[in-house]
């Protein structure tokens, strides 16, 4: 692959990854806020219960996100190995 095209592709993938991370952060923030903070609140500060709820919600969300990332990486590596084996099988015939 042309080095310039490879750099462009890497830059595009980085922008896409950053957008995905931002969207994931927005989803997490919205979901945890909806779950833990009542729609009509009277105080500007979070209550202890709301704070604990948000902490747990974010912790769970990040844990699941990490687990999914590891699993997707594992599956991606398996796919790469399978593709290499298939290419070796095609080139050896």
Curated annotation (Swiss-Prot):
Cystine connections: 32-57, 36-53
Subcellular location, principal: mitochondrion
GO MF term list: metal ion binding
InterPro entries, alphabetized: Tim10-like, Tim10-like_dom_sf
GO biological process, alphabetically ordered: protein insertion into mitochondrial inner membrane
GO cellular component, one term: mitochondrial inner membrane
Tagged with keyword Repeat: no
Membrane topology: Peripheral membrane protein
Subcellular location: Mitochondrion inner membrane
Pfam families assigned to the protein according to its UniProt record, in alphabetical order: zf-Tim10_DDP
Motif extent (Twin CX3C motif): 32-57
Entries under PANTHER family matching the protein: MITOCHONDRIAL IMPORT INNER MEMBRANE TRANSLOCASE SUBUNIT TIM10
Family that this chain belongs to: Belongs to the small Tim family.
Summary of the function given for this chain in its UniProt record: Mitochondrial intermembrane chaperone that participates in the import and insertion of multi-pass transmembrane proteins into the mitochondrial inner membrane. May also be required for the transfer of beta-barrel precursors from the TOM complex to the sorting and assembly machinery (SAM complex) of the outer membrane. Acts as a chaperone-like protein that protects the hydrophobic precursors from aggregation and guide them through the mitochondrial intermembrane space.
Subunit structure and binding partners: Heterohexamer; composed of 3 copies of TIMM9 and 3 copies of TIMM10/TIM10A, named soluble 70 kDa complex. The complex forms a 6-bladed alpha-propeller structure and associates with the TIMM22 component of the TIM22 complex. Interacts with multi-pass transmembrane proteins in transit.
Free-text comment on this protein's domains from its UniProt entry: The twin CX3C motif contains 4 conserved Cys residues that form 2 disulfide bonds in the mitochondrial intermembrane space. However, during the transit of TIMM10 from cytoplasm into mitochondrion, the Cys residues probably coordinate zinc, thereby preventing folding and allowing its transfer across mitochondrial outer membrane.
Stated name of the protein: Mitochondrial import inner membrane translocase subunit Tim10-A
Organism: Xenopus laevis
Gene name as annotated: timm10-a
């Amino acid at each position: 692959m042309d080095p310039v095209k490879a750099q462009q592709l890497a830059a595009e993938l980085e922008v896409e990854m950053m957008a995905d991370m931002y969207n994931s952060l927005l989803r997490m923030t919205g979901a945890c806020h909806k779950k833990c903070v009542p729609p009509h609140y009277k105080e500007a500060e979070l209550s202890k219960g709301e704070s604990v709820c948000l902490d747990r919600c974010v912790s769970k969300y990040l844990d699941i996100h990490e687990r999914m990332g590891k699993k997707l990486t594992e599956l991606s590596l398996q796919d790469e190995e399978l593709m290499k084996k298939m290419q070796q099988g095609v080139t050896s015939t």
